Amino acid sequence: MPRLFPLLALLPLLAACQMDSRQQVLATTNTQAAQRAMSTRAFDTGDRARVFTAVIASLQDLGFVIDRADNVLGTVSATRFGGGLVRFTVTVRPGEGARTIVRASGQLNHHELSDPAPFQRFFEALSQALFLQANQID
């Protein structure tokens, strides 16, 4: 019992170190908004199947092995080995009008990718693949 009193005295100090829940929500929202902006692109085509095929081709061009591809749901999961385990999941969905929205998420060794470079490389490869498809260049 005497040992319990010093521990109880430290309890208010620990509570003072805790972040306010409102601050947590605001910090998370900013981070999520930045992540969403970095990992989402809209393409000016209503042909979701063509974009879906281009996503698969782009991931393969970048050295990924396709784990799962579901055209009905519009999701592709892929893995790349070497320099760490990289997993990418891409969702293709219809947007407003004749647009298609592509959103990617990634993990490096089970940690969320926050570096914009892998997303930029993927979207550049996807844009090139869509351009080649539109111009029927194989």
Model-derived regions, located:
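Bacterial N-terminal signal peptides that target proteins for export
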Residues: M1-L7
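C-terminal motif of bacterial Sec signal peptides marking the signal peptidase cleavage site
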Residues: L13-A16
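Ser/Thr-rich, low-complexity intrinsically disordered terminal regions
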Residues: Q18-D138
